[in-house]
């Protein structure tokens, strides 16, 4: 569709597409085309998304000068995650059963209401709402859950122990890009509820919301990152990640690793002692452009293909 664009028109559309191209000129673009200069990794991934091309193929097959320093920074970040996960594993619910585990993903094909009992769903829902400092009225009804799941906009990842007890979980939802400001304002006021939002359509830009960033065993931590990486590689409509955390920066530094930006904060009064929780936004290109993530993709997806969502 954009093959016949002139250079001027293409540059204008790139500037309109993302502020990272705000200073792009015809001269700079010409140097890129001639191979005299190279755009940053972030801009390269943005261009791939702009043309709706396959990001996995691009990262696998493009030579990218990977910084050992940045890979070490990512590895150090992951070591902290594993430490936090080990701590959570010993204190979380069902922590007394630390044997064999299994992970199940509930999505539009394998919906949670058809495959999990009511009490377990209630437990998951109450935990997510509690971690966000929301009231029970924010919990989705069975019909709302099914509606959002069947549309592909709500996913539950659940980590079971050997006795089928829930050891850890993570809930992800997709929201319309145009709802971002409303979402943040409702979050700040602890009044998030699904009835304020419409589901994103199949051709609408959106963001992915990770309801609570909770880590556990190394197996779980790597599974969550793998699923997030694959989701972002498949879906060019997702423009950024939004997640909430109560952890201080010295324990979970999403800023220096992924250029995460705090866009909101609130006090969570749902615990015996109130805690401050932060809402953090990460651009997809900053996440996938991290040299540790690029190294992960190049090492783990050499002979694999990931189909893009339509």
Residue ranges of each PLM-predicted region?
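A short helix-loop-beta-strand connector motif used in the catalytic cores of GNAT acetyltransferases and
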Residues: 3, 146-160, 178-180
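Recognition helix of helix-turn-helix/homeodomain-like DNA-binding domains
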Residues: 15-39
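DNA major-groove recognition helix of helix-turn-helix/homeodomain DNA-binding modules
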Residues: 40-60
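Short, charged recognition helix plus adjacent turn
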Residues: 59-92, 310
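Short amphipathic alpha-helix that is part of the acyltransferase structural core
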Residues: 79-144
């Amino acid at each position: 569709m954009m093959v016949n664009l002139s250079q001027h028109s293409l540059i204008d559309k790139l500037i309109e597409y993302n502020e990272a191209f705000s200073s792009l000129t015809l001269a700079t673009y010409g140097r890129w085309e001639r191979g005299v200069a190279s755009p940053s990794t972030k801009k390269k991934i943005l261009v791939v998304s702009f043309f709706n091309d396959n990001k996995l193929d691009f990262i696998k097959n493009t030579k990218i000068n990977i910084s050992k320093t940045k890979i070490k920074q990512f590895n150090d970040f992951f070591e902290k995650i594993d430490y936090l996960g080990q701590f959570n594993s010993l204190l979380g619910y069902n922590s007394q059963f630390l044997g064999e585990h299994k992970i199940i993903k509930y999505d539009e094909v394998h919906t949670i209401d058809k495959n999990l009992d009511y009490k377990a769903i209630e437990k998951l829902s109450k935990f997510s709402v509690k971690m966000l400092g929301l009231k029970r009225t924010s919990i989705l009804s069975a019909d709302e859950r099914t509606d959002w799941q069947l549309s592909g906009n709500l996913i539950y990842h659940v980590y079971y122990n050997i006795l089928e007890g829930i050891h850890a979980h993570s809930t992800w939802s997709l929201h319309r890009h145009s709802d971002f400001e409303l979402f943040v304002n409702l979050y700040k006021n602890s009044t998030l509820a699904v009835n304020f939002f419409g589901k994103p359509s199949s051709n609408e830009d959106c963001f992915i919301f990770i309801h609570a960033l909770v880590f556990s065993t190394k197996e779980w931590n790597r599974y969550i990152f793998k699923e997030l990486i694959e989701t972002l590689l498949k879906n060019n409509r997702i423009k950024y990640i939004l997640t909430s955390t109560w952890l201080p920066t010295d324990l979970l530094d999403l800023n220096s690793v992924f250029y995460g930006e705090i866009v909101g904060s609130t006090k969570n009064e749902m615990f015996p002692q109130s805690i401050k929780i932060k809402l953090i936004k990460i651009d997809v290109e900053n996440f996938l452009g991290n040299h540790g993530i690029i190294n992960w993709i190049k090492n783990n997806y050499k002979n694999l293909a990931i189909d893009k969502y339509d």
